[in-house]
Amino acid sequence: MLFNINEKGEPLVISFAPFLSPEAIKHLQENERCSDQSQKRTAQQIEAIYTSGQNILVSASAGSGKTFVMVERILDKILRGVSIDRLFISTFTVKAATELRERIENKLYSQIAQTTDFQMKVYLTEQLQSLCQADIGTMDAFAQKVVSRYGYSIGISSQFRIMQDKAEQGVLKQEVFSKLFSEFMNQKEAPVFRALVKNFSGNCKDTSAFRELVYTCYSFSQSTENPKIWLQENFLSAAKTYQRLEDIPDHDIELLLLAMQDTANQLRDVTDMEDYGQLTKAGSRSAKYTKHLTIIEKLSDWVRDFKCLYGKAGLDRLIRDVTGLIPSGNYVTVSKVKYPVFKTLHQKLKQFRHLETILMYQKDCFPLLEQLQDFVLAFSEAYLAVKIQESAFEFSDIAHFAIKILEENTDIRQSYQQHYHEVMVDEYQDNNHMQERLLTLLSNGHNRFMVGDIKQSIYRFRQADPQIFNQKFRDYQKKPEQGKVILLKENFRSQSEVLNVSNAVFSHLMDESVGDVLYDEQHQLIAGSHAQTVPYLDRRAQLLLYNSDKDDGNAPSDSEGISFSEVTIVAKEIIKLHNDKGVPFEDITLLVSSRTRNDIISHTFNQYGIPIVTDGGQQNYLKSVEVMVMLDTLRTINNPRNDYALVALLRSPMFAFDEDDLARIALQKDNELDKDCLYDKIQRAVIGRGAHPELIHDTLLGKLNVFLKTLKSWRRYAKLGSLYDLIWKIFNDRFYFDFVASQAKAEQAQANLYALALRANQFEKSGYKGLYRFIKMIDKVLETQNDLADVEVAAPKQAVNLMTIHKSKGLQFPYVFILNCDKRFSMTDIHKSFILNRQHGIGIKYLADIKGLLGETTLNSVKVSMETLPYQLNKQELRLATLSEQMRLLYVAMTRAEKKVYFIGKASKSKSQEITDPKKLDKLLPLALREQLLTFQDWLLAIADIFSTEDLYFDVRFIEDSDLTQESVGRLQTPQLLNPDDLKDNRQSETIARALDMLEAVSQLNANYEAAIHLPTVRTPSQLKAAYEPLLEPIGVDIIEKSSRSLSDFTLPHFSKKAKVEASHIGSALHQLMQVLPLSKPINQQTLLDALRGIDSNEEVKTALDLKKIESFFCDTSLGQFFQTYQKHLYREAPFAILKVDPISQEEYVLRGIIDAYFLFDDHIVLVDYKTDKYKQPIELKKRYQQQLELYAEALTQTYKLPVTKRYLVLMGGGKPEIVEV
C-alpha cells in the first residue's frame, strides 16, 4: 500500500497486488502453457520473474532471454509497490546499464499507456522520473557513490577523480617503485634483496622484470576482498606448505597414476590388434610383445600398490622407475599407423622429474619471497599514499574504500541493507571476489537475484572467478534453504543447426575438470520455438581447413596471425552467400581471438571488394605512422641535433628526401670533428663547405634550402605561439593534413592528427607550457609501454563485421565465421618466472646454484632455473584454468550465430589422419587428451575422429590451392549502374576534358580568393584584437538574448603533485559569480559564498577567488554601487554576433563574443568588462583591451541605436579592485 497526494492535497491510497506464492506461479505456468500466444514464456522464465523472498541464482544459457527476465522481474516488482530506487541492479558494463535502463523506461511508458487507474498512472510516472536516479549501473559506479557520500568516515575526500589513463598510472607507479627500490637496496637486508632482483632480472641494473613482478602482484592483490590481508596471509601460503614430497597434493598424484593406468590400457588395446604381431613366424612371443606386456603389468602393479610400494615419500623413486620402464618415444606403430600411447605419460613424468633436487634448493628461496612480500606491501602502501595525496584513484581503490566503509560502519551498512528490497546482478559469472564481497555487504542475506552463465565466463584476465558462480550453484542445489537455482535452457536465438552442433561439441568437450561445468542435459541448449527446429540442409556447420601439406611441412600451426589462404576461404564463402543467397554483408560477422595481426583480413577483403568494419586494435595511437611523423617533427623543432627524429622528418612525405639524398648529406662531414650531427652536415652542404660539396646538386640544394627555411620558421613560431597553433602551422605549411587524406584509412589518419593538436592544447591548459615538456610527457608515456586512447571514426553500416570473441559477447549475428582456429592458445602466463594463485599465493622459478652437486669444478657457480613445488602446483591449476576459459570462449563464439557457423583453420591433411586415440572410453574426450590439445581446431578434429560414428552436425572439409584460384573464388555481383547500350557512356574523353576545365576553373578561383579561403567564418574579439586596425564598417549586428556554450573535453595524464589553478579558470569563475550574484541583497561575504555554491567550478578554483576584493568592488567603488542602484537596467553575460568584412579579401565573416555587463538607459548605454589579468600599471590593460571594448560598444550601438557613453574596465588582478575608463 502506498500513499500519494492529489492536486487538492488529499491522500491517495494505492493498493498493490501481493507477490505470487509458489502455487500461484505454478498456476501461471500452466495458463501460459495452454495459451495460444505465438511467443510463450517458458515455465523457467515465469519462475525466475515471479519467485520472491529468497536468494535466486538463474543459470541462463546463451540466447535464453536473461535480459527479458530481468526487465520483467523489475517491472513486476514496481507494479507490486517496490519503488525503482529500492532495487540495486548491477551490470557488467556501462553500455549494458544504459540498455537495461532504456528497456525499463519503455516498459514503464507502455504500462502507463495501458493503465486506466489514475492513481497507478501517477505512481508509474513517479517511477519513470526516478529511473535516472536509480542504482542501475556497474559496481564501480556504485562504489564511487558510496565513497563520495561516506568517504569522510575513512578519511577519504569526496572530491576525488578516477585515474582511467594507464599512462598516468604507469608514471606514478614508476615514481613510487624507483624510490622504494632505492630504499630496499640500502637497507640491512640488501644482500637478500639483491639476490631477489637477480633471480628475476639477471642483474640489479635492469630492474624491468622485477618491476613487472611487483606490478603484477599488486594488481592481483587488488582483485581480492582485502589486498593487505591477502598479501600478509596468502601470498606465501604455498611456499610455507609445500616443502616436502609428502606435501604434494593428492590430486596431482591421482593424475599421475591415472596417466600410468591409461597408458597400460591403451597399450593393451594396441597389442590386441590383429595386425600387431604378437607372435614370430616360429610361433613364439615377439620381443616387442614381451616388452609391452612387461610394461602393462608393471604399470598396473605400481598403480594398484602405490601406497605400499612407494607412497608420497617414494615418489621420486617411482618417477625414475617409470622413466626407465617405458620407451623414450611417444608412439607405437601398427600397420604404418601411429598410436600416441606414451605421449600423455611422458608429459606427466616431466612434471615430477627432479623433485628431490628441487625440494633441496627450494628452502633457499624462502628468504627471497619474504623480501618480495615486504616490497609489495610497502609498494601498495606507498602507491596508495601518493594517490590519496593527489586525490586520484583507480577503480579498485574506490571499491576497496566502499567495502571498508560498509565493514567498519554498521549503521551505514544496515541503512543500505534495509533500503534495498533486492540486490540484482547481471553477468554474475564474471564477478571477482572484491565485487562479491561488496554485494554480500549490501544484501540482507536472503534478497539476492543473480543471473549468469558459467559457460560464458571469459574475463579471467580481469580476475573474474567463475568458481564464485559455481560454488553458489552447488550450495543452492545441496541446501535449497540457502537459495534457489533456476535453469533457463531454451534458446530463442539460433536455428537447430547451430544448437545441435553446439551441443554435440561441448557434450564431448566440457566438464568440471576442463570448462568448470559438466555439459549435461541440464546445460544443453534447447530450441525455444518451433520455427527454430525447421531444418535447412545448407546451414550445416562447416570446419573449413586449408590443406598445408604443400606448405613447409615443418611450419608450425601456432602462427600468431591468420594466413592469406584462410582469409581467401572466408572471402570465397562470403561471395557465395552474397551472390547466391542474397545475404547482406552486415549479416556476416568474423570472430577472432585477439585484435592484433588482422590487417591481412582487411587487405584481402579490399582485393575482393568486400566491405569490412574492424573492431580496431590495441591502443596504438602514438605508434600510428602519421602521429609518429608529427612527433618526430616536434622533436626536431625542439632539438634539430636529434639525428633519429631529423632523419624521420626528412624521409617523411613533408620533405620526401630519399636514401640517395641522405647519403649525399651524410658525406658532408667536418674532418676535424670526431662526432658530427646530421643537422650540421645539412648546414655545411647548403654553404658548400662539406667534405664533398660536389655531391650536392642543384635539386638537392633547393630541397635543403626549403627545409632549413621551413624549420627555422617553425622553431621561431614555437617560441611565440601555442602548441596547438604550431601543429596546425605544420599541417598547413607542408599540406600534411591534406596528404594523409589521400592515403589508406584517410579518415582515421586525419582524426589522429586532429586529436594530436587537441591533446597538445589540453596539455597546455593543464598547467604545462612549451614544446619541450610536451615531448617529454609523450616520451615518458612511451617509456612505460603505454599509449593514448585511439580516436574513433564512424564506420559504414553495410559491411562485414570483424570483432573479437570478447566484444561479441551478448550480441548475435545470422552468419558467424570463427577464424584462426589453428592458433595455439596463449600459454605465456604458465611459462613466466612466477605464477600467482588466490589460494596458494605465489610460486616462482628459483635460480639455484647447483655447483655443490657437481663435485670439483673450476666454475665459480652453476645456475639452474628450477620450478619450485608451489610454482608447479600453480602452473597446473593455471593451465587448466586457461584451457577452461578457451573452451568457454569457443562456446561464446559458436552461440553468437543465428543461422550458420563456420570454423576456419589450417592443417596438414596427411597428419590429421593419424589416430588420436585407439578407443573411446566415454562420452567425453579423455581428460589427458583435452589437456594436451591447444587449439579450437584440435578439439574439433579429435571429436570428429573419436566420435566419427555419431552425427556431430558439422562437416570437415580440406581446401586445396586449386579451390582458391581467382576463378574458383569468384567475384561479387554488383548492380549495373550504367546502361551499356547508351552511347553517352563512351564519351570518356569529353568527360575528362570537362573535368579538367572544371579543375582549372577551381584553381583560378583559389588564386583569386586565397585570402578568403584562409579566413575563418567565425571569429572572436580576442582573435581580432591585434589583427586588423582600424575597424572597418559593419554591415549587420544582433544581440543574442540566450545561448549555451559547450566545451570539448580531451583528457590527458595529469602529473602534477599539486592541483594547479589556471588564471583562465579563475577568470571564468569570476564571470560566473558576477552573473549569478543577487544584487537585490546587501553584498557581503555570506552573500558571495551563497552565490559561489551555484557556479560550475571545482573547489580549488572557488577557493582561489578573492571574495574580499569582489566585496570591496561593490562596497567601496562608485561603479560597484552603481550596479546595485541601477540593477533593473543591468544586462549580464550577453552573447552577440556581428557581421564584418575582412579588409584583405573583402569577404564577410561572423564576429561572436560575450559582453560581461552593460546598462541600458533610454538615451545611452554604459559598458562594463571585468579583467583578472595581472598588471603593473592600469594603462597596460587599457591599451590591451581598448579595441575589444570598441567592438562591444559597436555591437551595442548597432543593436539599440543608442550611443555608448561610458566604457569601464574593472581590474581585479591587482591588490585591490581598480576602475579604468576607456
Swiss-Prot record:
Q: What is its EC number?
A: 3.1.-.-, 5.6.2.4
Tell me where in this chain the UvrD-like helicase C-terminal domain is found. 524-810
Q: Which GO terms describe its cellular component?
A: cytosol; DNA helicase complex
**Catalytic activities:** Couples ATP hydrolysis with the unwinding of duplex DNA by translocating in the 3'-5' direction; ATP + H2O = ADP + phosphate + H(+)
**One GO molecular-function entry:** 3'-5' DNA helicase activity
Q: Where is the UvrD-like helicase ATP-binding domain?
A: 39-495
Biological processes per GO annotation: double-strand break repair via homologous recombination
The residues forming the signal peptide are none
Q: Which Gene3D superfamilies match?
A: 3.90.320.10, P-loop containing nucleotide triphosphate hydrolases, PCRA, domain 4
- Looking at the UniProt entry, the stretches that span the membrane are none
Q: Which UniProt keywords apply?
A: ATP-binding, DNA damage, DNA repair, DNA-binding, Exonuclease, Helicase, Hydrolase, Isomerase, Nuclease, Nucleotide-binding
For the ligand (ATP), the binding residues are 60-67
What are its cofactors? Mg(2+)
Under InterPro entries, the record lists: AddA, DNA_helicase_UvrD-like_C, DNA_helicase_UvrD/REP, P-loop_NTPase, PDDEXK-like_dom_sf, PDDEXK_AddAB-type, Restrct_endonuc-II-like, UvrD-like_ATP-bd
PANTHER family found in the cross-reference section: ATP-DEPENDENT HELICASE_NUCLEASE SUBUNIT A, UVRD / RECB / PCRA DNA HELICASE FAMILY MEMBER
What NCBIfam families does the entry give?
A: addA_Gpos
Q: Which family does it belong to?
A: Belongs to the helicase family. AddA subfamily.
The subunit field of the Swiss-Prot or TrEMBL record says:
Heterodimer of AddA and AddB/RexB.
- Protein name as annotated: ATP-dependent helicase/nuclease subunit A
Q: Which organism is it from?
A: Streptococcus pyogenes serotype M4 (strain MGAS10750)
